[in-house]
Amino acid sequence: MSHPTIDTQLAVAAEDLSDARRGLQQTLEYLREQGQPWAFSDVQSIVEDPYVIGKIGDLQIRIDLAAALLERAQTLDGSPEQRLIASTEAVIASADALLAVDNVQHELTGQRQSLPSQAGREPLHWHYQVLGNHRLNGVAPPQLQE
């Protein structure tokens, strides 16, 4: 049985993950085609810079983690509470990946992708609260309380 909150959260997580992937791809293309190394570095190309390489690796891990959590949330056949917690984790991981991509894109290229509108979305900090209260105190998410 589906729950509207779970469906909404899965859609939000999928959108953020898609935007994060697109942003990473834009960043990679920019770095490969237009990026310039720092003037005082010992590299000929920005794509050889260990700092840049590490940043890209970090982003890829965040995106892969978000994708795995989203897939788990989409396929989980558990109680509504388990499914809602899984979708909350996917929302958090996807938002984290998107924000990290946006920050690194700005840091390395000077550009920013336009982030999705937050209108109609629950504040991200609220998802941490729901997840933490569930893990720490065993409290069911408020969306499931009657």
Task: Report residues per predicted region.
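Glycine-rich phosphate/cofactor-binding loops in nucleotide/flavin-utilizing enzymes
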Residues: M1-E15, D102-E146
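Glycine-rich beta->alpha junctions and the first turn(s) of the following alpha-helix
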Residues: M1-I61
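Aromatic-residue detector
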Residues: G23-L24, V47-D58, L69, L76-R83, ...
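Extended amphipathic alpha-helical scaffold segments
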Residues: L24-W38, A67-Q74, V101-Q105
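Short alpha-helical interface elements
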Residues: L31, W38, L59, E81, ...
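C-terminal helix-coil-helix/basic helical segment that borders enzyme active sites and/or dimer interfaces
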Residues: Q60, D64-D96, N103-L115
